[in-house]
Amino acid sequence: MSYLNLRLYQRNTQCLHIRKHRLAGFFVRLFVACAFAAQAPLSSAELYFNPRFLADDPQAVADLSRFENGQELPPGTYRVDIYLNNGYMATRDVTFNTGDSEQGIVPCLTRAQLASMGLNTASVSGMNLLADDVCVPLTSMIHDATAHLDVGQQRLNLTIPQAFMSNRARGYIPPELWDPGINAGLLNYNFSGNSVQNRIGGNSHYAYLNLQSGLNIGAWRLRDNTTWSYNSSDRSSGSKNKWQHINTWLERDIIPLRSRLTLGDGYTQGDIFDGINFRGVQLASDDNMLPDSQRGFAPVIHGIARGTAQVTIKQNGYDIYNSTVPPGPFTINDIYAAGNSGDLQVTIKEADGSTQIFTVPYSSVPLLQREGHTRYSITAGEYRSGNAQQEKPRFFQSTLLHGLPAGWTIYGGTQLADRYRAFNFGIGKNMGALGALSVDMTQANSTLPDDSQHDGQSVRFLYNKSLNESGTNIQLVGYRYSTSGYFNFADTTYSRMNGYNIETQDGVIQVKPKFTDYYNLAYNKRGKLQLTVTQQLGRSSTLYLSGSHQTYWGTSNVDEQFQAGLNTAFEDINWTLSYSLTKNAWQKGRDQMLALNVNIPFSHWLRSDSKSQWRHASASYSMSHDLNGRMTNLAGVYGTLLEDNNLSYSVQTGYAGGGDGNSGSTGYATLNYRGGYGNANIGYSHSDDIKQLYYGVSGGVLAHANGVTLGQPLNDTVVLVKAPGAKDAKVENQTGVRTDWRGYAVLPYATEYRENRVALDTNTLADNVDLDNAVANVVPTRGAIVRAEFKARVGIKLLMTLTHNNKPLPFGAMVTSESSQSSGIVADNGQVYLSGMPLAGKVQVKWGEEENAHCIANYQLPPESQQQLLTQLSAECR
């Protein structure tokens, strides 16, 4: 095998991006020829490639005249990375046609393709008169536009003057590229169970099954959740199993409104009113449809440039924005939201080197909206709750938030029902150095279960401030119910003034309720104060404090919660010290816990280049004390196994004693496996009195036009990998996900309205499988099942030595298989590499435009070639 073809073969079996035309060896030789040709004296201005630089016999070299015109590649379809004005747009298959003598080959881009990249087609004279599928002569229709193909990088560089571009935010993906997915049915299953041996209370068994089914048709998504439970114990006669329907809903996106329509069971957001479950209809904004540079709150930057200038924006010392602006006033409204606060330092650098620097204060709270952005929701239906103590009144709710200039936001909403009416209005402000604040008030009229009517007001405020110099973040949330007559909507749905949120009678068995399940409308909430503070200590430590205090009308009982902790790392050893306190208004006493956790990875003691399996393991120690004398100590190891790290394990052992409980040893062991067809887990725990075995399996089933594919539990948005013939290929960046025996796999999650990269690991392909391209990009809508297709060539990898009239075929000749699925370029000695070839067939060869500059070679391979990594063959081309 020649060196050039050996390199050609290695590149096509190891590279992730497998190109349609394999050109490495060819262009090495061609580059040498170009270098000499450039030094040769010419009698005219035209460039001439002397074939004698490549071979002694000019007839041994294919027609290279196209390269004399600057044409580096023959016309055809190539997969390239498209960059517009130095910004990455997409990776796509682009058809290139023959251009004029100076252009070489030029890309065939349609009007729709250019529009999807941000070109304002209406601003280009005559472009809208072209048919949708006609190639746009970009450089002739737009003055100063350029199109250049970088063959070595397989990158298409386009430049279009800014005057012809639409004003789009960073990260914008045109809705035309959003993929609603395929029609398909899906089923998620999650089964778990345990068996308990209790030396005191006897044996018991429990099982639980959660089924989440769905159907996608076009842009519509139908979803349903149902559960089944089973339990039996020695303390009760017989066993009990129960099916329960949880919810069903139908939804779709409304793209022009950047909104989502939900029919059936859903829930409202808790930004203005308390979130509630409902059965009805909802139309609400979906900010996931916005580019990341338009989500969350960020100030709008205004400035003036004396000339063409470079604008750089920093936050907390990091560059978060960089752009070039034309002379005159400019506006920047596509800054990515970064944290809750941190002033923005804006630098305008002019062409002459002079700079302007100013600071824009920045702090945020959750309700703040960008200038000009509106978020809304409209809901109508009936109140829905799994609590038998609550009724199902019909209601209407609407909310609206709108961003104003100068960092202001106004918002409000209304809730209307037969026994409840509430109106809310509020304002928020980015106060810069003083932080961010939002204040709102709700006026409510309520009728309680005893038919008493109440009027009341609730005032809420939210404050956030970061002290960047000291690394301190303060978030203060305060609720103050100024009158005793304020109730929320859920309070009016109860059928009684007090009781428990669970059934206290199960047949003949009396169920003892928990104090957390108790409610009493006579003691409605009065005021609540929450405070969260985080403090950065050096580079590797963080201190956090969080607490809340809830008071009630008519009683001195209060709810209290407090958490404090210190997280730190010394080299790669992590440890956490934490404290928690919980006090319920109807609880006697309080619950406290002091805990210490230490994790030490085994890699701490291994060389950085160690291949030991222990590099994926860690040792752990934990101690907890309830401050009433009871302490638990646990020590153990955890980590992952197998090549894909898809088998995780954890083993812990320890001792618990003191306080009111029994003393004795305790411990547990677990195994969790994540595979291409689903997940499984098993575990065992023990103490002196109780032994427990628990287990579970979970996964997803996807039924589509090409069959049924099993996978891991499916999230809302998934990707179906279709690579027929490429069985057992690993999907990159996915633990345990491989294609099945047909070449299909399911990626259990994807990010909606964003470009998702899906790639197959070519190192895991069978020896007789090759891919045109191992990477696909998809942009799914929410809830979509999108298909990522890969074209696999299943067949023999063949290194052919072709001769014509007993001489090697010309260097640079194009070779195409009979099915046109594989092609290559002849290197030295008439050798060419082809993949996906059948045992018998023919190849077509062309090395010029003359009538006698082409031939056909037939070949026949032995059956054992199918088991060989590479087969070599010589054939005569006639």
Named regions from a protein language model:
Residues 2-11, 18-19, 27-297, 626-702:
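Post-signal-peptide, soluble extracytosolic/periplasmic N-terminal scaffold domains
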Residues 111-116, 345-348, 669, 754-765, ...:
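A short, solvent-exposed beta-strand micro-motif common in secreted/extracellular proteins
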Residues 155-159, 366-369, 774-795, 859-878:
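Extracellular beta-sheet/turn segments enriched in Thr/Pro/Gly and aliphatic residues
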Residues 178-180, 205-218, 242-255, 392-406, ...:
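Feature captures outer-membrane beta-barrel proteins of Gram-negative bacteria and organelles
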